Amino acid sequence: MEHWGEPIPGTGQSWRQPLSTSGRGWLGSAPWRWLGPTSWRWLGSAPWWWLGTATWWWRLGSRW
């Protein structure tokens, strides 16, 4: 996200023009605060959950 001040493609608006000040606070803090730790935690646990689910589905499918 290096082009923070550049216009959004297709519009004349800038990334720094949110709908409201509350929107700016939410857009400025929530995604990064949420995506940071949560995504790392999810990425750390998801592969094992995904492998377990895939294996379970494979076993279920192989029985039919």
Swiss-Prot record:
Signal peptide: none
Stretches of the chain forming a coiled coil according to its record: none
The keyword Transport belongs to this UniProt entry's keyword annotation: no
Subcellular location: Mitochondrion outer membrane
Entry GO CC: mitochondrial outer membrane
Top-rank taxon: Eukaryota
Main location (coarse class): mitochondrion
Biased composition (Polar residues): 11-22
Residue stretches spanning the membrane: 40-58
UniProtKB keywords: Membrane, Mitochondrion, Mitochondrion outer membrane, Transmembrane, Transmembrane helix
Span list, region Disordered: 1-22
Membrane protein topology class: Single-pass membrane protein
Remarks, miscellaneous: This protein is produced by a bicistronic gene which also produces the major prion protein/PRNP from an overlapping reading frame.
Name assigned to this protein: Alternative prion protein
